């Protein structure tokens, strides 16, 4: 693409594999190539009934020592009996789950929830996982400043000639 000016909203995880001519400054290229990203995954679990709303349930928000880590109900104001529990996990747990197939991720989610809520298995319908680090458009999740990278954010945001960086 050729243009007089450009607003670029591409994560560094993708940008480092795009040929740019003329090249960005050495400082910008270093930051693009070395930007650190975390690992994050969501697993949405659909159930025929919202058993977590029952009076004797342990609740709608559960923090665990399992690979699912944090589980929240995600069916607020949704009509009907069905409901969604959503797990947020990151770091090593997300990396380990990220190496598994979608079916295996769902199986782990189902089994984990059945240990937390006795009735979970009988209402289970399906699970779907999103691991941002395997997404072809991001190849990463959240970025953060690693050791020695305190200036990266400023450098990555700085315009390079007619190219402006967003996101």
Residue ranges and their predicted role:
Residues 9, 18, 39, 53-167:
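Conserved flavin/dinucleotide-binding core of flavoenzymes
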Residues 27-56:
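Central beta-strand plus flanking loop segment that forms part of the substrate or channel wall
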Residues 13-16, 27-34, 104, 108:
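Short alpha-helical interface patches
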């Amino acid at each position: 693409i050729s243009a007089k000016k450009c607003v670029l909203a591409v994560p560094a995880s993708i940008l480092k594999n795009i040929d740019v001519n003329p090249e960005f400054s050495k400082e910008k290229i270093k930051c693009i190539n070395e930007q650190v990203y975390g690992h994050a995954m969501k697993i949405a679990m659909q159930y025929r009934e919202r058993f977590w709303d029952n009076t004797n349930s342990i609740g709608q928000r559960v923090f665990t020592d399992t690979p699912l880590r944090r589980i929240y109900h995600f069916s607020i104001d949704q009509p009907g009996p069905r409901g969604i529990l959503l797990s947020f996990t990151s770091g090593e747990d997300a990396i380990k789950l990220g190496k598994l197939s979608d079916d295996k991720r769902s199986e782990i989610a189902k089994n984990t929830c059945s240990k937390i809520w006795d009735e979970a298995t009988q209402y289970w319908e399906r699970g779907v996982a999103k691991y941002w680090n395997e997404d072809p458009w991001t190849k990463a999740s959240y970025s953060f400043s690693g050791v020695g990278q305190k200036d990266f954010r400023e450098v990555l945001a700085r315009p390079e000639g007619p190219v402006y960086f967003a996101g």
